[in-house]
């Protein structure tokens, strides 16, 4: 997936309204069964209002933005995978697409999605000996994300009061943890779960994720 397509998917699925369902942007999950509404240019023009409204209700995110401006960087995977940030993204997506999910429903989605991410990291470590290092996430962002400078991305960064660098390397950093994890895991999971006769690459890729995540149960 190209950097531009990756960011577009992130915006369309802003909060994993099923939880990447990352709401949407679930690199390590195949539960995206619900069709997501596509955002229009007009929707993006409302980004600032949508973000501002949610920030008023979630002071924790405002505090994180302030820490970013002060140069503080979360240095642990557990800190990166925040339920509050997942909930923030879901609520922004909810506002942009004019949906009417309750706060309780959106919080539950955020908790589920974040829990899946944490479990995926645990299974990768315990079953495959795979860990994700901060340096690997930084390198992934440098190669695949930082070069994307679309209008939508700039609008989002401005709505948050961040530079593109702060958005990519700090605020949205958690998005890319699972990308790095899956890149490292794929060869190992493929050895354990071979491709079936007649199975398409897409179907195989989705099945790999499903069967890997089943190990979390």
Language-model regions: role of each:
Residues 1-7:
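Short, low-complexity patches enriched in S/T/P/G
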Residues 2, 20-69, 157-217:
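PPIase-associated folding chaperone regions across multiple families
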Residues 9-25:
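Hydrophobic membrane-insertion alpha-helices, especially the h-region
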Residues 37-164, 169:
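N-terminal targeting/tethering segments
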């Amino acid at each position: 997936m190209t950097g531009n397509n990756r960011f577009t998917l992130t915006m369309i699925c802003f909060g994993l309204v099923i939880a990447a369902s990352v709401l949407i942007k679930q690199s390590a999950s195949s539960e995206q069964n619900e069709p997501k509404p596509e955002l229009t240019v007009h929707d993006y023009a409302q980004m600032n209002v949508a973000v501002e409204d949610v920030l008023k209700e979630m002071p924790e995110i405002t505090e994180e933005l302030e820490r970013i401006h002060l140069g503080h960087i979360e240095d642990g995977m557990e800190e990166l995978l925040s339920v509050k940030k997942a909930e923030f993204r879901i609520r922004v997506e909810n506002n942009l697409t004019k949906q009417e999910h309750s706060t309780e429903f959106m919080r539950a989605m955020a908790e589920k999605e974040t829990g899946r991410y944490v479990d995926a990291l645990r299974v990768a470590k315990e079953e495959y000996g795979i860990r994700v290092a901060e340096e690997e996430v930084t390198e992934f962002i440098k190669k695949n994300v930082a070069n994307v400078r679309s209008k939508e991305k700039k609008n989002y960064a401005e709505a948050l009061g961040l530079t593109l660098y702060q958005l990519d390397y700090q605020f949205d950093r958690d998005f890319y943890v699972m990308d790095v994890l899956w890149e490292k895991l794929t060869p190992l999971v493929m050895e354990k779960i071979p491709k079936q006769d007649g199975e398409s690459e897409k179907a195989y890729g989705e099945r790999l994720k499903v069967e890997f995540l089943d190990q979390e149960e």
